[in-house]
Amino acid sequence: MIPLHENLAGKTAVITGGSGVLCSAMARELARHGMKVAILNRTAEKGQAVVKEITAAGGTACAVAADVLDRMSLERAKEDILGQFGAVDLLINGAGGNHPDAITDVETYEEAGEGQSFFDMDERGFLTVFSTNFTGAFLASQVFGKELLKADSPAIINLSSMSAYSPMTKVPAYSAAKASINNFTMWMAVHFAETGLRVNAIAPGFFLTKQNHDLLINQDGTFTSRSHKIIAGTPMKRFGKPEDLLGTLLWLADESYSGFVTGITVPVDGGFMAYSGV
């Protein structure tokens, strides 16, 4: 168990997409360190299970409905959070995911191939995936940013991906959005550097989540060929576990540990990026 970061106690964290596999683990850990945690999802009900876990363990949390692509929805969520917790100290932009309309069925183009090709992808599906993963972080940062600037040691942590560095096959919209997240993280870090607001990102390696389950796990529960490629390309020879992200999360969230760190994206990937394949 990670030692408690006393500097985080009493502060408020807002987590978009907070009920997801990775972000819910972050929410529980931040609450363990004494932070008040607001879990944002399209419906408040999606976050209630995480809130119950946190409160049962003695922490403080609330579930709030918010659509990260709707500014007014985010504004209402902000007012709700301020009414309950009084401030915002940390924003984690974790909302994201994929959609079948923005995924090709084959890794490389085949003229006579079956299934959805690049030319078959639906524009609306592509834009929805890109917007959810990138524009949602932009809007949430705008809405909560003014409150963050009032805090003593504010921080934004964006969720990136291995696909930001070298785009994964099949998921062009997701890959483009995550590359944009890395760039936007650096832009915001410079823009707000003199205010004390630090902006960084975490790029998880390959973790099993609800969003990628069908790409990585067959119906019979075995690994897909894509999973086998991932494991072969990961020197630690396994998928990541949510708890693998928590040390990096706490380091970036706690100014006493990372007060001079801004504008970086930290890979937590079991060596995936370092491995050349030979």
Curated annotation (Swiss-Prot):
Induction context: Induced by galacturonate, repressed by glucose.
UniProt xrefs under PROSITE patterns: ADH_SHORT
Domain of life: Bacteria
Pfam family, one: adh_short
EC number: 1.-.-.-
Other facts: Member of the exu locus which is required for galacturonate utilization.
Family of the protein in this entry: Belongs to the short-chain dehydrogenases/reductases (SDR) family.
Stated name of the protein: Uncharacterized oxidoreductase UxuB
Source species: Bacillus subtilis (strain 168)
Gene name of the record: uxuB
